[in-house]
């Protein structure tokens, strides 16, 4: 019997959990200990033969400094509701209506006429400065002479007087008598100097800490609460809380044009990932990345000068770090740790370049919202592990861990036992993968407005949470996260600069609703984009469109690539033209699908052009179709919510679109609940059951040889590939 593997696991602890931590570390084979928000590392455990992670907050947990420097408290751009001028005379607009006053406070320290903006939303034009005043006592902007029945909003800066992450933890754990932590802005001069010196002192005061776990750096993702302390606005990628007059003045000097609040407010959409980014926002994002990276490096260098590793938490105050951007790799971070909600968020961590190792913090977090009487943490743990495992087998994190209050988890012994099994399984698969890339058939490109910088992040609003408008599209990335393809995220700007970039791919996918960032909107009216995609397909490439791909009403078509896809959408303009292609056909793509396929929200009013083949329709709404264009092929699918069956359907669609059907049955399972991955570096391959029930399947190895296999629930079996 081989010796049991240990290490690659981090466990949380607290001052009253010393012996319990030692026992759990022994059972789980942990080699690292961590503290969390609301817990402390016991001195006794600092002497254990394990890495000690110390959570470090650069932006909070120092209210004395924040209160002494109110001008350098973190700020956020907010926009009021729309208000209509219903009568002649002045219009008063309340700033804080539907906002939580314990979290936010309007910034009147800096010149409001310079940094606030009143916009006529009927015309889209900002009001001249003498057209409005501010009533500070009532926190209302007064528009002196508004146009009758025009709509108006106010964009304003507000101080974040209660850190939103601390607020969330405070509410979730029902903390009592805990001071609200204020968020201060490390980018500003006084605070920057203070934080740098404070970190240097901390290094000397904490010689036993091995890893500084920055949580995180400087700017919180956009998270705003309403008057009932409920979430009002969230964007995990949002930049709206990365602003201050100091930062914006620097930005103006760099770009050479005057800043407008509208560049951040974006009509109230705040440049979320579903928006096609404006030039001004791209400029701001680029500026923030570079400046954040510069300051990150200062703090990271301090860690290294004191023989400590620097680790970044992927979340909270992470805005501007952009791990897939151009500047992150120059910071010198040793590691990134992030929360794992599914396969997509796993790849969001494990694919990060420029660090020595990555770590996934798995769910559930040891908080009372799950660990309570009647709670079922083991169920959440199983779903989390099995869902993420598909992605781990393609691109693993180097470590796994858990967070929260260990004492809560100890009340669930079956949970403790299951996590022990997870840790053992993770170490074995990591060892068998050999630290090298698994076998991939070819490259799949995902084409959208954001490209590489939002790798694995499109269709995400709040972290790993499905929305009605996104789940039918997020399923594409979730499926891809565990498939044997190299996946590259390509932006329309990349294509404009280098049209042949698509030729590196076997298949290109465009997925999303019309006019959104993922689909592309007006980018499809750019002849360089449309011509490049058409050339790619005509010369033998494959194109898969999901939802409303290439949608932008232009020159008589709603789908710019209608002739490539073989479908278009009827929006009422072409109803006078009859449509006669309505017959369904059997096809290679749907051979493993049930008669009824789950397209999620689906799509209305899609019709097939002459020559296209319909694979599924709902009445006279085409849900799936295929088409030939030149030497290449295209597939249209209305939506792909994640499921094992849909993942197989997409898998077959990719091979068909690439014209490589004959290659599909290499490292392949006939049962779509079971998947196969091969690792050339170690000559090992695994067969994994993604379900909670036993499965039977036919397995095809790399030479196309087939054999039958039975697997237990959640099973993962490892074999050595013999080529003779």
UniProtKB/Swiss-Prot annotation:
The active site is at residue 316. It catalyses: beta-D-galactosyl-(1->3)-N-acetyl-D-glucosamine + phosphate = alpha-D-galactose 1-phosphate + N-acetyl-D-glucosamine. One of its GO terms (molecular function) is 1,4-alpha-oligoglucan phosphorylase activity. The keyword Glycosyltransferase applies. Keywords: Carbohydrate metabolism, Glycosyltransferase, Transferase. Its EC number is 2.4.1.211. One of its GO terms (biological process) is carbohydrate metabolic process. It holds the Pfam family LBP_C. The keyword ATP-binding does not apply. Gene3D superfamilies: 3.40.50.880, Glycosidases, Golgi alpha-mannosidase II, Immunoglobulins. It is an enzyme of class 2 (transferase). Reversibly phosphorolyzes beta-D-galactopyranosyl-(1->3)-N-acetyl-D-glucosamine to form alpha-D-galactopyranose 1-phosphate and acetyl-D-glucosamine. Active towards galacto-N-biose and lacto-N-biose. Does not phosphorolyze galacto-N-tetraose or lacto-N-tetraose. In the reverse reaction has activity toward N-acetyl-D-glucosamine and N-acetyl-D-galactosamine, but not L-rhamnose, D-glucose or D-galactose. Belongs to the glycoside hydrolase 112 family. This is 1,3-beta-galactosyl-N-acetylhexosamine phosphorylase Cphy3030.
């Amino acid at each position: 019997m081989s010796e049991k593997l240990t290490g690659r696991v981090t466990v949380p602890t607290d001052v009253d959990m010393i012996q319990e931590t030692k026992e759990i570390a022994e059972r789980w084979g942990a080699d690292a200990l961590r503290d969390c928000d609301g817990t402390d590392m016991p001195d006794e455990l600092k002497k254990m033969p394990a890495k000690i992670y110390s959570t470090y907050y650069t932006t909070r947990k120092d209210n004395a400094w924040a209160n002494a420097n109110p001008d350098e408290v973190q700020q956020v751009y907010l926009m009021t509701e729309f208000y209509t001028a219903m009568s002649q005379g002045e219009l008063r607009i309340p700033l804080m209506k539907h906002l939580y006053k314990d979290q936010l406070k309007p910034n009147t320290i800096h010149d409001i006429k310079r940094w606030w903006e009143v916009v006529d939303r009927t015309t889209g034009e900002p009001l001249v400065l003498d057209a409005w005043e501010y009533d500070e006592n009532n926190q209302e902007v007064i528009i002196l002479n508004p146009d009758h029945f025009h709509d108006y909003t106010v964009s304003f800066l507000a101080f974040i007087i209660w850190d939103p992450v601390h607020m969330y933890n405070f509410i979730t754990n029902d903390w009592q008598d805990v001071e609200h932590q204020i968020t201060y802005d490390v980018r500003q001069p006084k605070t920057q100097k203070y934080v740098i010196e404070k970190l240097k002192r901390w290094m000397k005061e904490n010689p036993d800490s091995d890893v500084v776990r920055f949580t995180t750096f400087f700017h919180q993702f956009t998270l705003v609460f309403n008057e009932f302390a409920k979430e009002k606005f969230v964007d995990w990628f949002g930049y709206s809380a990365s602003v201050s007059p100091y930062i914006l003045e620097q930005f103006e000097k760099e770009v050479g044009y005057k800043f407008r609040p509208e560049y951040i407010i974006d009509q109230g959409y705040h440049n979320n990932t579903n928006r096609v980014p404006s030039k001004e926002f791209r400029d701001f994002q680029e500026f923030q990345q570079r400046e954040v990276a510069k300051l990150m490096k200062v703090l990271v260098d301090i860690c290294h000068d004191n023989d400590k590793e620097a680790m970044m938490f992927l979340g909270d105050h992470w805005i501007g770090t952009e791990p897939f951007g151009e500047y992150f790799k120059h910071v010198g971070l040793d590691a990134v740790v992030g929360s794992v909600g599914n396969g997509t968020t796993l790849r969001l961590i494990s694919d990060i370049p420029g660090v020595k190792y990555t770590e996934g913090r798995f769910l559930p977090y040891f908080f009372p919202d799950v660990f309570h009487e009647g709670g079922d943490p083991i169920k959440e743990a199983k779903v989390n592990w099995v869902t993420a495992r598909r992605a781990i087998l393609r691109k693993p994190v180097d470590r796994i861990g858990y967070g929260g209050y260990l004492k809560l988890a100890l009340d669930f012994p079956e949970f403790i036992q299951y996590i022990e099994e997870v840790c053992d399984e993770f170490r074995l698969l990591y060892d068998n993968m050999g630290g090298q890339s698994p076998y991939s058939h070819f490259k799949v490109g995902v084409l959208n407005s954001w490209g590489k910088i939002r790798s694995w992040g499109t269709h995400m609003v709040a972290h790993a949470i499905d929305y009605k408008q996104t789940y039918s599209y997020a399923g594409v990335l979730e499926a891809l996260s565990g498939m044997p393809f190299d996946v590259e995220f390509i932006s329309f700007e990349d294509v404009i600069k280098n049209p042949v970039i698509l030729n590196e791919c076997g298949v290109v996918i465009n997925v999303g609703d019309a006019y959104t960032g993922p689909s592309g909107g007006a980018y499809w009216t750019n002849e360089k984009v449309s011509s490049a995609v058409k050339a790619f397909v005509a010369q033998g490439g494959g194109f898969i469109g999901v939802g409303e791909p290439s949608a932008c009403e232009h020159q008589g078509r709603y789908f710019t690539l209608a002739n490539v896809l073989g479908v278009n959408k009827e929006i009422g303009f072409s109803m006078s033209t009859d449509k006669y292609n309505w017959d369904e056909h059997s096809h290679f793509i749907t051979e493993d699908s049930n008669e009824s396929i789950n397209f999620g929200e689906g799509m209305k009013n899609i019709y097939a052009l002459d020559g296209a083949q319909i694979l599924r329709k709902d009445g006279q709404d085409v849900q799936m179709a295929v088409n030939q264009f030149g030497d290449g092929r295209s597939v249209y699918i209305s939506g792909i919510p994640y499921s094992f069956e849909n993942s197989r359907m997409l898998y077959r669609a990719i091979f068909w679109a690439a014209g490589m059907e004959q290659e599909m049955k290499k490292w392949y399972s006939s049962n779509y609940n079971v998947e196969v991955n091969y690792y050339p570096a170690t000559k090992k391959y695994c067969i994994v059951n993604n379900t909670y029930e036993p499965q039977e399947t036919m397995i095809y190895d790399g030479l196309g040889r087939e054999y039958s296999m039975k697997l237990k629930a959640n099973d993962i079996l490892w074999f050595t590939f013999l080529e003779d």
